[in-house]
């Protein structure tokens, strides 16, 4: 298997002293699997796409945040009007006496520890910081170099305060409409999602919520739910021995034949063929071995 493309620091940071850079992806195009000489924070503002991080697929959209380590490998596929910012940084170039280890990964051994959601309020606070950070990181004087690190610290604190796990939005004190619906959808991977009941419970207008969701993500609510269910199915096909019919049920598909048809249409291969890609072939002995 060919090694992933390596993105080098010198192609993104103006000098060997500059610790931070911002690359605006307006829009983010399909990008092959790659790794880096630096770390990055990815914040999605609009649209949607498939983000494959360390072989784990995520259907990403407005408000998704990823902390990417240098050794991680990831790619972007099936993008639709995907708008995001990459905040690139080199940990070894950070000199402020800050508790970076509590603000930036590694945060723990969990596979999805680098994936978070950002509240609507958090997005509003983060955006002007990123804009200023982008301006300062294009300069090479010593004051700008120091200011970029200060701005990165400010951004890291804002993200720490306003990030949450997708399935825990209901714990937020002031849940915004988009945060609430995202949480509910994440908790409905294997069960029926009752839109009318959700809106009644949270005192929301169904039509307005659907319009807001499509405006921010570029998808309907039902399409997004189907996409995250398919991403969950891919994870189960790769990492479990469950029967395909059981996986279909775990991902909200009552009919396994319908699941196979939808999966094949979206992935370009059947669930069985997809699973076969990740089954290692046994090593056969050579002729000289007993």
UniProtKB/Swiss-Prot annotation:
CDD domains membership: cupin_RhaR_RhaS-like_N
DNA-binding region location: 196-217, 244-267
Superkingdom: Bacteria
Site (Interaction with sigma-70): 246
Main location: cytoplasm
Stretches assigned to the HTH araC/xylS-type domain: 179-277
Listed GO CC annotations: cytoplasm
Subcellular localization, as worded in the UniProt entry: Cytoplasm
Annotated function: Activates expression of the rhaSR operon in response to L-rhamnose.
Name under which the protein is recorded: HTH-type transcriptional activator RhaR
The species this protein was found in: Yersinia pseudotuberculosis serotype O:3 (strain YPIII)
Taxonomic lineage from the root: Bacteria, Pseudomonadati, Pseudomonadota, Gammaproteobacteria, Enterobacterales
């Amino acid at each position: 298997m060919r090694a992933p493309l390596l993105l080098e620091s010198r192609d993104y940071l103006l000098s060997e002293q500059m610790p931070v850079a911002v690359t605006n992806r307006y829009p983010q195009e399909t990008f092959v699997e790659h790794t880096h000489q630096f770390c990055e924070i990815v914040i999605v503002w609009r649209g949607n796409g498939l983000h494959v991080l360390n072989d784990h697929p995520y259907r990403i959209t407005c408000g998704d945040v990823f902390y990417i380590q240098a050794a991680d490998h990831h790619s972007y596929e099936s993008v639709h009007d995907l708008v995001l910012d990459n905040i690139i940084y080199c940990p070894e170039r950070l000199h402020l006496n800050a508790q970076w280890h509590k603000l930036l990964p590694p945060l723990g051994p969990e596979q999805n520890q680098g994936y978070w959601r950002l509240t609507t309020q958090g997005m509003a606070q983060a955006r002007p910081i990123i804009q200023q950070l982008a301006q300062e990181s294009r300069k090479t004087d010593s004051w700008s170099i120091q200011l970029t690190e200060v701005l990165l610290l400010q951004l890291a604190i804002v993200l720490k305060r306003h990030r949450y796990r997708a399935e825990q939005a209901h714990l937020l004190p002031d849940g915004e409409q988009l945060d609430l619906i995202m949480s509910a959808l994440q908790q409905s991977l294997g069960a029926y999602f009752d839109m009318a009941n959700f809106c009644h419970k949270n005192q929301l207008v169904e039509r307005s919520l659907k319009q807001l969701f499509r405006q921010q993500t570029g998808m309907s609510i039902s399409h997004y739910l189907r996409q995250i269910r398919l991403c969950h199915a891919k994870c189960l096909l790769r990492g479990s021995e469950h029967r395909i019919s059981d996986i279909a049920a775990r991902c909200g598909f009552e009919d396994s034949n319908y699941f196979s048809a939808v999966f094949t249409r979206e992935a370009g291969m059947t669930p069985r063929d997809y699973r076969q890609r990740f089954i290692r072939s046994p090593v056969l002995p050579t002729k000289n071995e007993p």
